[in-house]
A protein has these predicted regions:
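Sec/Tat signal peptide C-region and signal peptidase I cleavage site
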Residues: 17-25
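Bacterial N-terminal signal peptides that target proteins for export
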Residues: 1-9
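Extended interaction-bearing regions that mediate binding to partners or small molecules
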Residues: 24-120
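Bacterial N-terminal signal peptides
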Residues: 9-18
Length: 120
């Protein structure tokens, strides 16, 4: 059984962008969108397998029929920061409602020497 819980988006982004053992602490703030663990797993898979390393403008949608939540992830820009390959990625998450909430977040992550991505 999946348990719904209030998720703090920066922590979600840390889980999405960092390897499982590489989770990082980030500043936190509340969100109106409640995501399930299955939602988080879908977002992580999209970022890891279909967004990182792809051309700028790549936009991949995700939808979880079990929770009713959906959204998309978009690679907005590639850049070099302190000699590291980095990507600016936008996240849009939409709740099943009612009411329906849509929230947008933007993070820059950089490729680490060990092959993981870390939010900077």
């Amino acid at each position: 059984m999946l348990l719904n819980h209030k998720v703090l988006i920066p922590a979600v982004a840390g889980l999405m962008l960092a390897g499982a053992a590489q989770a990082q602490l980030l500043p936190t703030w509340e969100t109106n969108v409640t995501l399930t663990q299955q939602d988080l797993d879908m977002i992580h898979a999209v970022v890891t397998n279909q967004v990182h390393g792809k051309p700028v403008g790549t936009r991949v949608t995700w939808s979880n029929p079990a929770s009713g939540n959906s959204g998309y992830v978009k690679l907005n820009k590639k850049l070099v920061k302190n000699g590291q390959q980095c990507e600016s990625i936008g996240y849009t998450v939409r709740s099943k409602g009612p009411p329906v909430y849509t929230e947008h977040y933007y993070f820059t992550s950089c490729l680490q020497p060990d092959g993981t991505w870390k939010i900077v």
